Amino acid sequence: RKIRSRGQTIRVYSIDGLVSSSELSDFVVKPLMMADGPLDGELAEELVIYNAVGSRVLDMDDAVSKLVNGFCVVLFAEGDAAAFEVKTGEKRGISQPEVENTIKGAKDAFTETVRTNTSLVRRHLRTPELRLEEQVVGRRSLTNVTLCSIAGITNHALVEAVSRRLAEIEIDGM
């Protein structure tokens, strides 16, 4: 999201499903827009810190790490950056699968909401290489599906083939 404050352009980055848009708006964007004078990372921390956990962003790796952990990253005109924690809360509780028994690992099950499911995957795979490709399947139901892969690990040709086959599905509902 790009915002203007006191003639300065500020960019706010976040990952959909991992941050609360209302908290982002109320506790980060609004205080930044109400600032007196030019903004940088240090002043932004002072303005926002009473509402959200914040820290300076040191480099691109730090920014990516913050993004995949439920923070928003704010970039200022001079190249300065800060991150603020605005994690989202769950909608319907993610519970243990009723049909599948697991011995090791997470005991989470997907819900009906694709956004909740993709954020669940992101919480377990906190790598910037995780790729989520969204598509719509079904002529009438227009069901959102997400193809997940990890760049550098997943066979790219296989991902393209699955994506193509999803796009070719001709069905009323899914």
Regions picked out by a protein language model, each given a short descriptive name:
Residues R1-M174:
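Membrane-embedded alpha-helical signal segments
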